[in-house]
Amino acid sequence: MPRPVTLFTGQWADLPLAQLAPLAKSMGYDGLELACWGDHFNVQEALSSPQYVKDKHALLAQHGLQCFAIGNHLVGQAVCDLIDERHQSILPPHVWGDGEPEGVRQRAASELANTAHAAAKFGVKTVSYTHLTLPTILLV
């Protein structure tokens, strides 16, 4: 296969993945970079539930799509940003916690490491975040 053409799903997070997948295929995409928001990819579920991983793979396969990367850009934003109340709306509650900036940064960094582990369980070798892309081998 020549270089695959992929769609990052973050801009489409208001659509359930079950609706977005057939749309992406109809637009000619070979695969997706799943965002870790909306219902596209849940890091904690992927870490704790083999069935979750199987179901996501089945959904993509049903539409002839592959997953080439997992994108956790919103959490990645919190690693180096100056944290303030605006971050609460883009972060999962377990990352935001009490909103204390250093705690948010530490939890965000931990969540990115967990994203790499979840991606590995999903069979994906690339995690992207805040304009950076690293092979999961560097993070796992």
Per-region residue spans from a language model:
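N-terminal pre-domain/capping segments
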Residues: 1-124
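Short, basic/glycine-rich phosphate-binding loops at helix/coil junctions
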Residues: 126-128
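Conserved small/polar residues in nucleotide/adenosyl-binding loops
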Residues: 130-136
